[in-house]
């Protein structure tokens, strides 16, 4: 299995896989243009024969925080290590950039506990994530995802004040 940074020609495969899980709410729907614009965030896994198996993205909020996003593998690749290899590559990339806090929102926290992630009870502790994505998410008022972080929770925010994130999260209820 090969894990590598995505190339622009991978965008249609990433788009198809990510959006195949958007209908049931597992992942948020992403536009093809958005995938293309952010393709450098993605890492992909391929079989030894070059078959696309899965992807994951690492989004940078600043030198203090990044987020693992859209980590997904094809059904036939589940339990074969592709997701683990992608996640390990994303963690390594964050470490190469000197980022000590990695966050994510998920419905499968047990997978991420094995990699040093822990739950964050109050999502407003991650104001950059709230301001970048959550306030425009269609599930804002009924979010069922678990916030998790690996490393310390950042004490700085570049996108919005912590107090406003706290209000936004608590208004969502």
Name what the model sees in each region.
Residues 73, 79-94, 104:
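Conserved acetyl-CoA-binding loop-helix of GNAT-fold acetyltransferases
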Residues 100, 106-133:
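Conserved active-site alpha-helix within GNAT-family acetyltransferase domains
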Residues 29-42, 47-48, 54-65, 69-73:
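A conserved beta-strand-loop-helix scaffold within acyl/acetyltransferase catalytic domains
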Residues 14, 18, 112:
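Hydrophobic pocket/interface hotspot
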Residues 10, 64, 107-108:
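A generic "binding-loop/recognition-motif" signal
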Residues 17-29:
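Helix-loop element at the rim of GNAT/NAT acetyltransferase active sites that forms part
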Residues 2-14:
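A short beta-loop-alpha structural element at the N-terminal edge
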Residues 126-173:
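C-terminal "cap" of GNAT-fold acetyltransferases
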């Amino acid at each position: 299995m090969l894990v590598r940074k995505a190339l622009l020609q991978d965008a249609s495969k990433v788009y198809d896989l990510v959006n195949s899980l958007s209908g049931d709410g597992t992942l948020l729907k992403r536009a093809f243009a958005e995938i293309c614009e952010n393709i450098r965030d993605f890492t992909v896994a391929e079989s030894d024969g070059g078959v696309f198996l899965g992807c994951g993205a690492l989004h940078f909020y600043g030198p203090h925080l990044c987020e693992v996003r859209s980590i997904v593998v094809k059904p036939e690749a589940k339990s074969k290590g592709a997701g683990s290899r992608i996640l390990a590559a994303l963690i390594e990339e964050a470490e190469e950039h000197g980022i000590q806090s990695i966050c994510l929102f998920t419905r499968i926290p047990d997978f991420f506990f094995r990699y040093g992630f822990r739950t964050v009870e109050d999502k407003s502790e991650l104001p950059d994530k709230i301001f970048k994505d959550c306030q425009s998410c269609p599930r804002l008022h009924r979010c069922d995802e678990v916030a998790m972080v690996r490393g310390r929770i950042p004490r700085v925010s570049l996108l919005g004040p912590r107090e406003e994130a706290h209000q936004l999260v608590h208004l969502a209820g």
